[in-house]
C-alpha cells in the first residue's frame, strides 16, 4: 500500500515540491515500514527576464543554482523546451539518473489551477499562458513529476519552511522582478 505525503518545499528565488512515498512491506516481512526517498529535486523560478533554476537534495539543501534567459519571443513558445534542456543538461553533467529525481517545482508569474495549469495569458512572458505547464514540462523531461505554483506564493512558502519566516505564525511577502507579486 502506498501512502503519499506531500511536502511543500519552496524557497525564495528557488522552488521545489517533493513527494515522499512510504511503502509498507508485504505481510510476514519483519522490516515494517520503509521510507523510500529519492535524492534530488529541481526548482524553477520562472521570471520575465530569466529563469532561476536550483538543484536540491530532497532534504532541501541547495547543491547548485544557475540562470537561463527567458525566451519570450513567439509568445514564449520555447520557454518550456529551454527549461527542460537546462534540467536535462544538468542531470547529464552531474550524472544524475532520472530515477533519483523526485520531481520539479516551478513558480510562474500568474495564477495557477490545480498545481498544473496557467489559465490566463502572462504578460511578462510574451503572452505565454493558457497551457498545462505541468503536463507539457513533464513530457519534455521524460515523465518527471512537475508541480506548478504562483511564484510569489511559493516564495512565501519557502520563507515559512526554511527562510526568514520560519517559526512565524503569519507572514507577508511581496516579490519584485519583471513584475510585482504578493
Positions of predicted regions on the chain:
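Glycine-rich phosphate-binding loop of actin/hexokinase-like ATP-binding domains
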Residues: 166-182
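Short, positively charged and aromatic/hydrophobic N-terminal segments
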Residues: 16-20, 25, 33
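Short glycine-aspartate micro-motif
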Residues: 41-45, 101-105, 171-175
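Glycine-rich phosphate-binding loop and adjoining helix at the ATP-binding site
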Residues: 76-85, 99-104, 110-170
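Short glycine-rich, Thr/Ser-proximal phosphate-binding strand/loop in the N-terminal lobe
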Residues: 40-81, 85, 118-120
Amino acid at each position: 500500500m502506498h501512502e503519499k505525503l506531500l511536502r511543500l518545499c519552496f524557497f525564495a528565488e528557488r522552488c521545489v515540491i517533493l513527494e515522499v512515498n512510504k511503502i509498507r512491506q508485504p505481510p510476514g516481512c519483519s522490516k515494517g515500514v520503509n521510507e523510500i526517498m529519492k535524492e534530488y529535486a529541481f526548482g524553477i523560478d520562472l521570471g520575465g527576464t530569466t529563469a532561476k533554476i536550483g538543484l536540491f537534495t530532497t532534504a532541501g539543501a541547495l547543491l547548485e543554482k544557475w540562470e537561463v534567459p527567458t525566451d519570450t519571443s513567439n509568445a514564449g513558445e520555447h520557454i518550456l523546451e529551454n527549461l527542460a534542456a537546462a534540467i536535462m543538461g544538468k542531470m547529464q553533467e552531474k550524472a544524475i539518473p532520472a530515477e533519483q529525481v523526485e520531481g520539479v517545482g516551478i513558480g510562474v508569474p500568474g495564477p495557477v489551477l490545480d498545481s498544473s495549469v496557467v489559465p490566463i495569458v502572462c504578460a511578462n512572458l510574451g503572452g505565454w499562458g493558457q497551457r498545462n505547464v505541468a503536463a507539457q514540462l513533464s513530457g519534455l523531461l521524460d515523465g518527471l513529476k512537475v508541480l506548478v505554483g504562483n511564484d510569489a506564493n511559493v516564495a512565501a512558502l519557502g520563507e515559512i519552511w526554511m527562510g526568514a519566516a520560519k517559526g512565524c505564525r503569519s507572514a507577508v511577502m511581496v516579490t519584485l522582478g519583471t513584475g510585482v507579486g504578493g
